[in-house]
């Protein structure tokens, strides 16, 4: 008879490494050698949600408001530069088209 550890799991039995399983799977060494299916012992405890990104939170509303205002100012500056570049590109394109049409009309 096999010995039982302090957690109630027989020796030679290990926990599955897969996080996608919905149950804890304990596999006995002999079962693994004989290519037999693993034994399901008990259900998995509830999962703990871990945030993907740890965003530091300001301690006060005033700091949060100031941080939000600073981010909005940066965003507005970037959008302003993008709008200026798009306007410049459009004006340049229109000037090029007008110039090419004017020169092609003179040739005829």
From Swiss-Prot:
Segments in the Virion surface topological domain: 99-108
Post-translational modification: Phosphorylated.
Keyword match Ubl conjugation: no
Keyword line: Host Golgi apparatus, Host membrane, Membrane, Phosphoprotein, Signal-anchor, Transmembrane, Transmembrane helix, Virion
Residue spans, topological domain Intravirion: 1-77
One GO term describing the cellular component: membrane
Keyword Signal (UniProt): no
Bilayer-spanning residue ranges: 78-98
Localization (cell): Virion membrane; Host Golgi apparatus membrane
Topology within the bilayer: Single-pass type II membrane protein
Chief location bin: virion
Similarity annotation: Belongs to the varicellovirus ORF1 protein family.
Subunit structure comment from the entry: Homodimer.
Name assigned to this protein: Structural protein 1
């Amino acid at each position: 008879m096999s010995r039982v550890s302090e957690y109630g799991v027989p020796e030679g039995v290990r926990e599955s490494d897969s996080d996608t399983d919905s149950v804890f799977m304990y596999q006995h060494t002999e079962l693994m050698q004989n290519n037999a299916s693993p034994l399901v012992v008990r259900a998995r405890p509830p999962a703990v949600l871990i945030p993907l990104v740890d965003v530091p939170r300001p301690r006060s509303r005033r700091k949060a408001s100031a941080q939000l205002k600073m981010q909005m100012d940066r965003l507005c500056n970037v959008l302003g530069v993008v709008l200026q570049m798009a306007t410049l590109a459009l004006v340049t394109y229109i000037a090029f088209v007008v110039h090419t049409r004017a020169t092609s009309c003179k040739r005829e």
